[in-house]
């Protein structure tokens, strides 16, 4: 195998495919990238046996063939070469990477040992605007847990909802729901968020085909293919947590709320909540940390309902408000012990349900 390509283009396809490679895998082959060249096209594949990423690049193909190269080292080596054309040649158990002087020789891994990746796309595919899906996943993904000991909570639920797609994630402290109109879906599948987080950075955000199969979810664009193993678990019943109406409602500018919570977080630690006193005329935020001090401020807003004080984790509150794509934030509550619902003014496509902290 021998190719020539522009340094930045080659580094890009190696880096994007390398996002699927597990750095801690006990199998050396899973720390490599499969590079295949045929007909002027380079295809690069990385996998950890649960997530696979395949990227493509048109190259000057001097000789077709295949090799497996160390993922991180190869991508870093190409990136460190001088700008311009780069050559990559595989022969006699080594891969030589050269460009305008510098030369790397890397040990080749066995192509025969690399896992077989099925390129077949399931029959039921949906065409989506990749940018829309990537944005929706970035919003709802804040609710997913990072605790691998609870795999059910590490995923994003894809399910049909009124002819469209609904995305749902929860870590048991908060629930994020995003409805995406114009994207059809059938059934429901639970997909690991750690892989979905890489969607835009691996295959891009252009026109996309999405297929949710029995074993894996597949996302394909003209820049690449991301396949993720489905989580075989039952997602928590969440609909009962979303009441049809709330008796208390606050409207407040997003920037003002974010700035105020940010100042409160300077005093608070992760386990110390910010208190929100909701009353006619707005909201009073306060945080008290006995050994350090306190911070208090008032934000003007529109409030209807009974005066009440509710407390939230500062980080969870900040992440939820930041994810809302609106200049005005709506906070709806039932009482100080039940979850509060955050969404944008006139927009409930994204909803963020946050458990309060008991005072």
Predicted regions located by residue number:
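Structural preference for solvent-exposed beta-strand-turn elements
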Residues: 1-359
């Amino acid at each position: 195998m021998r190719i020539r390509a522009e340094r930045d283009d080659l580094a890009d396809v190696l880096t994007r495919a390398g996002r699927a490679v597990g750095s801690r895998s006990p199998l050396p082959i899973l720390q490599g990238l499969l590079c295949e060249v045929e007909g002027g096209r380079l295809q690069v594949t990385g996998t950890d046996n649960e997530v696979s990423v395949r990227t493509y690049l048109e190259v000057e193909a001097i000789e077709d063939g295949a090799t497996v190269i160390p993922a991180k080292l190869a991508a870093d080596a190409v990136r460190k070469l001088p700008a311009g054309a780069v050559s990559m040649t595989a022969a006699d158990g080594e891969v030589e990477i050269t460009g305008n002087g510098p030369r790397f020789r890397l040990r080749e891994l066995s192509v025969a040992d690399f896992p077989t990746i099925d390129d077949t796309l399931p029959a039921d595919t949906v065409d989506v605007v990749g940018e829309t899906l990537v944005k929706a996943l970035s919003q709802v993904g804040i609710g997913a847990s990072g605790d691998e000991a609870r795999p059910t909570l590490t995923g994003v639920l894809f399910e049909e909802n009124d002819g469209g797609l609904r995305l749902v994630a929860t870590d048991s402290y908060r629930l994020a729901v995003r409805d995406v109109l114009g994207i059809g879906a059938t059934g429901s599948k639970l997909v690991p968020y750690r892989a979905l987080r890489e969607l835009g950075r691996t295959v891009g955000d252009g026109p996309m085909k999405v297929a949710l199969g029995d074993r894996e979810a597949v996302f394909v664009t003209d820049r690449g293919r991301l396949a993720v193993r489905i989580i075989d678990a039952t997602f928590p019943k969440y609909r009962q947590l979303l009441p049809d109406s709330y008796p208390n409602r606050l409207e407040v500018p997003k920037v003002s709320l974010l700035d105020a919570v940010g100042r409160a977080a300077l005093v608070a630690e992760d386990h110390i909540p910010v208190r929100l006193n909701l009353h006619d005329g707005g909201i009073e935020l306060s945080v008290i940390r006995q050994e350090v001090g306190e911070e208090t401020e008032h934000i003007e807003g529109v409030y209807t309902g009974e005066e009440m004080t509710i407390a939230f984790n500062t980080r969870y509150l900040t992440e939820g408000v930041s994810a809302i794509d609106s200049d005005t934030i709506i906070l709806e509550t039932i009482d100080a012990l039940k979850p509060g619902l955050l969404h944008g003014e006139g927009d409930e496509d994204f909803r963020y349900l946050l458990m309060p902290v008991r005072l």
